[in-house]
Amino acid sequence: MAREQYTTVTEGTHIERPESQLVHRIGIYGWRKRCLYLFVLLLLIILVVNLALTIWILKVMWFSPIGMGHLHVTQDGLRLEGESEFLFPLYVKEIRSRVDSSLLLQSTQNVTVNARNSEGEVTGRVKVGAQMVEVQSQHFQIRSEDGKPLFTAEERGVMVDTGRLRVTGPEGAIFEHSVETPLVRADPFEDLRLESPTRSLSMDAPRGVHIKAHTGKMEALSQMDIILQSSDGVLVLDAETVGLPELEQGTPGPSGSSKGFYEICVCPDGKLYLSAADEATTCEEHSHICL
């Protein structure tokens, strides 16, 4: 609203009256003023709510200057206390437990550890499942505490570097193909059995095969024939007594029918040879083989 201003003077003073001026009020009045106050109040309420939520989140998530909850940030990396669950892949350089506790990796399905090259291709994999443990790599090796190789597996073969490979199963060890070893020995006071249930058993060595029983006996049982053959050497039975208990005993035949029969003769050094059978012994006649 506008109003006219008048200037009053004392009597006898002549002052020129200024022209009439219009004066305008500056400000927000009415419903605009109430809306502005309401908007400022709403902003203040939102600010207080945000501050309260921020304080609540900091308290619930256990934020601190050294980390968040059980997750602490150290100079060596991240340190996590207690059990943790990762819903997505985890990429780290090293995972280790505390000095006084073990490291446990657990999953309801399986645990898979992959090693990748710079191109992202899998170069090694360890998969622990419910029924099997699978290792995929070009070279697999188990070392002792001092770094000595104990077990090595690769495409060329499997090598056990321990002083002794011991199989404690009741059925022993089953090999589908050949086995190369310098020594096969049973435990003390236990029997050693080499068995092939459906096929033959062969032992080959370029410098000989040595079988020895220190305190017990040695048996070779066969349903068919047992053949002891030496192509260039001799067959030596070095014992005080050589017995053939199950040797079949012959029966007298007609006289003059000794043709085609031989008798076994023994040299002083134990060498055996055959001599044509006759009514009397003929070993002395053919004893030149003992010379």
UniProtKB/Swiss-Prot annotation:
UniProt topological domain (Extracellular) ranges: 59-291
Keyword Chaperone: no
UniProt-annotated location(s): Cell membrane, Sarcolemma; Cytoplasm, Cytoskeleton
Keyword field: Cell membrane, Cytoplasm, Cytoskeleton, Disulfide bond, Glycoprotein, Membrane, Signal-anchor, Transmembrane, Transmembrane helix
Membrane-traversing stretches: 38-58
Entry's Gene Ontology BP terms: cardiac muscle tissue development; heart contraction
Top-level lineage group: Eukaryota
Cytoplasmic side: 1-37
Membrane topology: Single-pass type II membrane protein
Residues bearing carbohydrate: N110
Pfam families (UniProt xref): Sarcoglycan_1
Disulfide bonds: C265-C290, C267-C283
A GO CC annotation given for this chain: sarcolemma
Record keyword Repeat present: no
Subunit structure: Cross-link to form 2 major subcomplexes: one consisting of SGCB, SGCD and SGCG and the other consisting of SGCB and SGCD. The association between SGCB and SGCG is particularly strong while SGCA is loosely associated with the other sarcoglycans. Interacts with the syntrophin SNTA1 and FLNC.
Family: Belongs to the sarcoglycan beta/delta/gamma/zeta family.
PANTHER family: GAMMA-SARCOGLYCAN, SARCOGLYCAN
Its biological purpose: Component of the sarcoglycan complex, a subcomplex of the dystrophin-glycoprotein complex which forms a link between the F-actin cytoskeleton and the extracellular matrix.
Name of the protein this chain belongs to: Gamma-sarcoglycan
Provenance organism: Mesocricetus auratus
Gene responsible for this protein: SGCG
